[in-house]
Amino acid sequence: MTRAYLAFTETGLVLAKRLAGSLPGSVARCGQNGISLAEWTSAQFVHSDALIFVGAVGIAVRAIAPHCKSKTTDPAVVVVDECGRFAVPILSGHLGGANDLARAIAAVCGAVPVITTATDAHGIFAVDEWAKHQNCMVLEPERIKLVSGKLLAEQPVYYRTDFPVTGTVPAGLFPADTPEKADFALTLCPTGQALHLVPRIGVLGIGCKRGTSADTLEAAFAAFCTRHSLAAQAVTAAASIDLKQNEPGLLAFCQARGWPVRFYSAAQLRSLPGQFTPSPFVQRVTGVDNVCERAAVLDADGSLFYPKFACSGVTLALACRPFAPDWRWQNA
């Protein structure tokens, strides 16, 4: 988490530096070195994961108001009074991590964390905070309130998961008898009206002909997702053979998706143990019998989830990084 602290007085600056000593981040003082409240807030809203105002809540609220867009994209915002008595998360408490940050700040300076989200106030399971702790993407944030509302009303909430989850199941949660009954689901393949939490664990292995365009790769990926009912948000990176490291279309496709792409030599791919879909043609051209499956598994250091899929001269496969979810939804 990248943090940015803003103080307004010398006393506040001392506290900001103290906090940054334990919870690293940039430190600035409003009015010093030409720093204005509006400019600092505008810049840090884009570049930082968390903004910490050491001052009054009202100042922070007015500063961030023009920039607030979505609970899924807004950074965490916490306000700490300059005497370090209270730490108040005011934006992105769960998905952005502001509640956890307020608790961490409180632990450093002895403040009281002032947590006002309803699930925290009642000490009950917060599905969006759980998703963040399990490195999952929330596909339908508007459905969070439906799950939380049931728990707050002491109604049963049903879940389904495609992965074993360790630990004690939180109060009020019960496994769904059928997929249709689930209120939320931990899955790579969302279906139905549940709130879907998608683990960010996928690596897309890619093979393609020379000169393949980004548009062709995008169309192939869309077809791949449709074939498997896969949420595109599950993919976090791509991998291929080093023969493709200068392919403009491949690089542009990955850049547009925001994925890092890593390349491996034929020798590295050949050295990977396991059963993969062989191709004599690919063997002749690249020196290894399969590119997409091997590259995905090697990069993920995990297991093959979906095997080779061919479309318009493109081959794709999905491997998943090790994933061991538990029922923890807050930092200890």
Ranges and model annotations:
Residues 241-294, 300-304, 310-314:
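C-terminal non-catalytic interaction/assembly regions of soluble proteins
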Residues 1-26, 305, 312, 319, ...:
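N-terminal basic/disordered segments at the start of proteins
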Residues 23, 109, 256-257:
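Short, structured coil segments at secondary-structure junctions
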Residues 25-35:
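A short beta-strand-loop structural module common to alpha/beta enzyme folds
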Residues 40-46, 184-185, 294-301:
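Conserved phosphate-binding catalytic cores of ATP/NTP-utilizing and phosphoryl-transfer enzymes
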Residues 12-18, 34-36, 44-99, 104-108, ...:
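Conserved mixed alpha/beta catalytic, RNA-binding, or beta-rich assembly cores of soluble enzyme
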